[in-house]
Amino acid sequence: MTSKVGPVALKTFREKLGPELLEVFDKSYKSFTDVQVLSGTHLLNLSDVVVESPTGSGKTLAFVLPMMRMIQNAKLQPADIGALILSPSRELCSQIVSVIQPFAEKLNLTVETVTGGQKVDKNIKMFKNKNVNILVATPGRLFQIIQHEKTLIARKMRTLQLLVIDEADRFNEIQFEDHMREILSCIPKQRRTGLFSATQVKEEDDLMVFGLRNAKQVKVAQERNSAAPSTLKNYYVECRADEKTSVCLEFIRQRTDKKILIFFPSCNSVRYFYKIFERCLGKRPLFAVHGKCSNPHRASQIKAFSDSTNGVMISTDVMARGIDISDIDWVIQFDLPKHSSWFVHRAGRTARCGREGNALILIASEQLAYVNFLDNHEKVKLDEIKVPTNNSRKSEELRQKMIKIQVSDRAILEAGTRAFVSHVESYAKHDCHLICSLDDLNVVGLANSYALLRLPKMRELSQRKDLDMFDRSAIETSEIKYADVKLEANRETVMKEKHEKKVETLAAKDKKRREKEARKLKKMGGRFRNGGGTGRKAEEKKALKRKAEEEDDAQNDIRLLKRIKRGKLSKKEIKDVL
């Protein structure tokens, strides 16, 4: 339903929460949002809920507040788990815990997280030795723990009051269904369940995976039935594929006082463009996070970006959900997201809590149909803007600069190649391939936007007919060295070993070939001596016979020399031979 909360409903909700929770809430928050009142009321009335609400609307508190009250009413023992919250990433889990913590401290409840990045044994030890009242977990890690200690987890979960699935639209893969089925087998059926997302939770059948019964639908929509906040302005810039990097950098340079978040398609892309951007943006604060960063590194980078006034963060989709940084001015998407719904989540990192924000996606000429696709499928309208300071000359100058950067360090050269490969692999898997297919992608242009010196061989590109348009660099890439002395020393050692092995292999092949030819000639010579024939011309037969005889003479000479060396011949015999 789409609704505005009236004063009576608001008053009733406040009364249901009780004074202790209200005391904590009123210290940190100004007022309740619609989604918090609507979903919270249903949960406190012991109904399951499916909640769709825009990013930045306060969805986390929408389940935290009723959850805390339900646990408070249940009067659990110190070791009883009263709530389980499943979220798709470590960052989201950390964000949720930070919201829960003040309320948990007030009620003397303990909160723990179970996510990837830690050893499973450590998680199991925590369950055995610690009291946990609220568990925040990623489904994959909880599934792993259940595989080891199902009885222990089932015993701990027997008092569960509420199951929350945060960012529920992300949980629609087959693997997740297997994980969810195992998790549900460990928790009581008599519980409440809440599904929360910024975009529509999938079909009715998908809800059965989560064990919902007669769920109440809560939909807090923005104008045009959009999942994006009304204070968010969405734009696109059309450019040639080979100019994307240049357009992105020029756009950032024009906005020296703005905080900007840029989404790239893969961890490899983030690593590569961080190296490029740090050499192109001067003293501008630059940060980077991706799924393969360590937890401490990610946390420190996110905090530093949050504290900055005009920082630039390069990221994968680990920053697309749940990371609450209120003052991001611009979100840039370097290319199409894997799923169109992710556009909404990415863009939702700006324009939070009523603040104005802007989102931009870089669209190559062959991708223009994506603009209408977003409007039709996600109700997101994009307006076109220009980047007037960019032109072909600047793009080529940047490409040459990027090449020099790669030549200065082999590690960056290799990072660029890996980034390009990951980009193509990611593009092949997005959900609008009917209108933006890999076959239509300007691969050569994309390679130039990465400033590649060589086009890597890829299965996805094996049938392309346009790759000969790529201008291969004359630079000998094998001579490019690592800037890191240890890496370069190791590379030289490996290259030397490979060269020696290659020489040995070639020598062995040559020896084998010569031995084979000798055996063949000897065999042919034997046939001629025995009066055999091969049906060849007389000249060829004579030549083969001559070679065979020469080979026999050579073998006789070798045997004779060996006998002389061993002293097997008398002086007279040696004289006769000579």
From Swiss-Prot:
<feature type="compositionally biased region" description="Basic and acidic residues">
    <location>
        <begin position="536"/>
        <end position="549"/>
    </location>
</feature>
<keyword id="KW-0067">ATP-binding</keyword>
<feature type="short sequence motif" description="Q motif">
    <location>
        <begin position="7"/>
        <end position="37"/>
    </location>
</feature>
<keyword id="KW-0347">Helicase</keyword>
<feature type="domain" description="Helicase C-terminal">
    <location>
        <begin position="231"/>
        <end position="393"/>
    </location>
</feature>
<feature type="compositionally biased region" description="Basic residues">
    <location>
        <begin position="510"/>
        <end position="526"/>
    </location>
</feature>
<comment type="function">
    <text>Probable ATP-binding RNA helicase.</text>
</comment>
<dbReference type="InterPro" id="IPR011545">
    <property type="entry name" value="DEAD/DEAH_box_helicase_dom"/>
</dbReference>
<dbReference type="InterPro" id="IPR001650">
    <property type="entry name" value="Helicase_C-like"/>
</dbReference>
<feature type="domain" description="Helicase ATP-binding">
    <location>
        <begin position="40"/>
        <end position="218"/>
    </location>
</feature>
<dbReference type="GO" id="GO:0003724">
    <property type="term" value="F:RNA helicase activity"/>
</dbReference>
<dbReference type="Pfam" id="PF13959">
    <property type="entry name" value="CTE_SPB4"/>
</dbReference>
<dbReference type="InterPro" id="IPR000629">
    <property type="entry name" value="RNA-helicase_DEAD-box_CS"/>
</dbReference>
<dbReference type="InterPro" id="IPR014001">
    <property type="entry name" value="Helicase_ATP-bd"/>
</dbReference>
<keyword id="KW-0547">Nucleotide-binding</keyword>
<feature type="binding site">
    <location>
        <begin position="53"/>
        <end position="60"/>
    </location>
    <ligand>
        <name>ATP</name>
    </ligand>
</feature>
<feature type="region of interest" description="Disordered">
    <location>
        <begin position="507"/>
        <end position="557"/>
    </location>
</feature>
<dbReference type="GO" id="GO:0016887">
    <property type="term" value="F:ATP hydrolysis activity"/>
</dbReference>
<dbReference type="InterPro" id="IPR027417">
    <property type="entry name" value="P-loop_NTPase"/>
</dbReference>
<protein>
    <recommendedName>
        <fullName>Probable ATP-dependent RNA helicase DDX55 homolog</fullName>
        <ecNumber>3.6.4.13</ecNumber>
    </recommendedName>
</protein>
<dbReference type="Pfam" id="PF00271">
    <property type="entry name" value="Helicase_C"/>
</dbReference>
<dbReference type="Pfam" id="PF00270">
    <property type="entry name" value="DEAD"/>
</dbReference>
<dbReference type="GO" id="GO:0003723">
    <property type="term" value="F:RNA binding"/>
</dbReference>
<keyword id="KW-0694">RNA-binding</keyword>
<dbReference type="InterPro" id="IPR025313">
    <property type="entry name" value="SPB4-like_CTE"/>
</dbReference>
<dbReference type="GO" id="GO:0005524">
    <property type="term" value="F:ATP binding"/>
</dbReference>
<feature type="short sequence motif" description="DEAD box">
    <location>
        <begin position="166"/>
        <end position="169"/>
    </location>
</feature>
<dbReference type="GO" id="GO:0005730">
    <property type="term" value="C:nucleolus"/>
</dbReference>
<comment type="similarity">
    <text>Belongs to the DEAD box helicase family. DDX55/SPB4 subfamily.</text>
</comment>
<keyword id="KW-0378">Hydrolase</keyword>
<dbReference type="GO" id="GO:0043186">
    <property type="term" value="C:P granule"/>
</dbReference>
